[in-house]
Regions:
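A hydrophobic C-terminal alpha-helical subdomain
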Residues: 16, 215-277
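Oxidoreductase cofactor-interface core, primarily capturing Rossmann-like NAD(P)-dependent enzymes
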Residues: 2-30, 38, 46-49, 56-59, ...
């Protein structure tokens, strides 16, 4: 068994990943912005504080490219340098589906830095999380019974964060997929009317999809206290959703985990309490 660092351990993917790795017998060190504890180190990617301490004795690592920022390549360079110096056996980096489309984009520049580092790696690029519907898009659902997004009839192959964690748990501990990148999707592509119907069925309430403008989405994100730069970034990438870039389906989850991805209807049943407020 290995000593594995999880950067982003308190997040939507990080939490189930930690549980899975511990269940497999690995020693997990959680890196978060919180105060250190018995199995937790404090790490600030913006200042670089705690990077050297976090990697002490580490053999393998999962690294979440930090959300809420637009300079992930700059923030992650010291992480890759420390991992290289420590001789890590594997580093799994999570960015986002489509991150490799533009070589000048911060996500892609971070990926390239890892690819060229000499560290055995995997890059995973998940599509839009199913869990966005019980977080980012939750307010409109519980207050108005509506999914409010500027996406029209476009479809997305939404992925459950638990599947992302399952993939990461396999990749970080194995070498047979070394130095490969994977786009991660669910097993079906749904439009937001279909999503609304699934949520309605799971909750026995009426939930509808309402197409809105980009400006309305931005206003809602800012009202939810998201940083302006990140809110604007979300509006931009949702524009790609509307253009159909989130519809493709891959077999990566099944290839790596040996099972089919979680269906949206199952996600809706598992999280139904989130929308019953």
């Amino acid at each position: 068994m290995s000593k594995i660092l999880v950067i982003g351990a308190s997040g939507t993917v990080g939490k189930p990943l930690v549980e899975l790795l511990r269940g497999k017998g690995h020693q997990v060190v959680r890196a978060t912005s919180q105060e250190p504890g018995a199995d937790q180190v404090k790490l600030d990617l913006v200042t670089g504080e705690g990077i050297a301490t976090a990697f002490a004795g580490i053999e393998r690592a999962f690294v979440l490219a930090p959300p809420g920022h637009t300079n992930q390549d700059v923030l992650l360079q010291p992480v890759f340098a420390e991992a290289k110096a420590r001789g890590l056996k594997k580093l799994v980096l999570m960015t986002a589906m489509g991150a490799n489309a533009d070589p000048a984009a911060p996500f892609r520049k971070a990926e390239i830095a890892l690819e060229q580092s000499g560290i055995p790696y995997n890059i995973i690029r998940p599509n839009w999380f199913m869990q966005n519907f019980n977080s980012y898009w939750l307010h409109g659902i519980v207050t108005q019974g509506k999914i409010l997004l500027p996406v029209g009839k476009a479809k997305g192959s939404f992925i459950d964060a638990r599947d992302i964690a399952a993939v990461a748990a396999e990749l970080v501990a194995r070498s047979d997929f070394d130095n490969r990148d994977f786009d991660l999707t669910g097993g079906e592509a749904l439009d937001h009317d279909q999503v609304a119907e699934a949520l309605s069925q799971a909750t026995a309430t009426r939930i509808e999809f309402q197409d809105i403008t980009n400006e309305a989405l931005l206003a809602g994100l800012l009202a939810a206290q998201l940083p302006k730069a990140y809110a604007e970034f979300l509006v931009v990438i949702i524009g790609y959703f509307k253009l159909g870039y989130s519809e493709p389906i891959t077999d990566a989850v099944e290839t790596i985990t040996g099972r089919s991805p979680i269906r949206f209807t199952q996600y809706a049943k598992d999280y139904r309490a989130a929308w019953l407020r």
